[in-house]
Structure formats: C-alpha cells, structure tokens
A protein has these predicted regions:
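C-terminal, non-catalytic "cap/extension" segments appended to globular domains
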Residues: 4-8, 12-16, 20-21, 30, ...
Length: 184
C-alpha cells in the first residue's frame, strides 16, 4: 500500500513540474530506485541461492563466498559495469543474508506487484473505469493480510503465475525510462 501511495504522490509531483530538468531529475531518481529494488534484489537472491547450494556441499571461506558474490553480481550487472576487488566483500554488509535469509525477493516481488497495479490503474483511468479500480483497491486495503496475494490480485484481473503479470510491472519501468529519455 505504501509503495502504491508513493507512486501516486510521485506522479503528481512529476506531472506538476513545469521545468524539464526538474522532471528529468525526479524521473532519473525514481528509475534508479526501481532498478535497484528489482534488479539488485534479484541479484541478491541469486547470490543467496548459489551460496546456500555451495554451502550444502562444503564449508566456505570468505574468499569463496566473495567469488560467488562477484559471479552473481557480474551476471546481474552485465559488461557495462566494472567491479573491482574492493567490491568482493560487499556481501558482508547486507544484514538480510544473515538475519532474514531469502527475504530480499520480497522487495522485487512487491515492486513489480505495485507496478502492475499501477499499470492497471492507468488503464482504468484511460477507460474512465478508475472508480472500479479504486473500489477494488479499497477492498484490498480493508482485507489486509487476510487474503493470499493471488486471490487479492484476481480482483484486478492479475495473475502472478503468468508472465504477462511480470511484463506489466517491468513495462512500467521501461515506460518511465522512455519518458526520461524523451525529455531533451
């Protein structure tokens, strides 16, 4: 709920800007934040998965853990981002790996879920059916944690087991990048 409310406030703030540079700065910050939330957290999850698989076979040294870290981060970052030896121990600063293992996926999941909901909201506004979306959204908030997420998403015609759900969420990020690039 808080991330959806953030998006409402963010969109209002961006849309109220009359200066292209202000819009650009806001959009660039939001895109960076969204990419960090989705791409970075998935990379963290991949690290945890690889780490635990390797640990199931043998005890690992800090250097071996750092090797796994570098391998998974380079795979996520691609060739455009260069990581040096100073990046090797960074895994040690992420408390989730110790205190709440395998939790980081929730950040990426939550962000993509909200992005998909936001896209549905935008479509509802465009088709003048936003009152139905708002009613469903209020019911979602009222339900709190009493419904499983898959049941709750059905009210919005969303199914997280389908690739289209994830594409919808990622398309929002792509659209925001396009909007940012369109500001000359």
């Amino acid at each position: 709920a808080s991330v959806f409310a953030e998006m409402l406030a963010f969109r209002q703030l961006v849309d109220s800007q009359t200066n292209a540079e202000s819009r650009r700065l806001l959009l660039a910050g939001k895109v960076e934040d969204m990419l960090n939330t989705v791409v970075r957290q998935i990379a963290f999850h991949n690290f945890e998965t690889e780490l635990h698989q390797a640990r199931a076979k043998a005890e690992l040294t800090a250097d071996e853990i750092s090797d796994i870290w570098m391998e998974t981060q380079r795979a996520a970052l691609g060739p455009a981002i260069k990581t040096g030896d100073d990046y090797r121990p960074i895994w040690g600063y992420v408390p989730h790996f110790i205190h709440t293992p395998f939790y980081v996926y929730a950040y990426a999941f939550g962000d993509c879920l909200v992005n998909a909901l936001w896209q549905k909201y935008q479509l509802a506004q465009a088709s003048k059916t936003d009152h139905l979306f708002i009613e469903n959204y209020k019911n979602l908030l009222k339900a709190g944690g009493t419904e499983r997420y898959d049941v709750a998403l059905q009210h919005f015609d969303l199914d997280a087991s389908k690739p289209a759900f994830w594409s919808l969420g990622l398309d929002m990020i792509s659209g925001m990048i396009d909007e940012l690039e369109g500001l000359k």
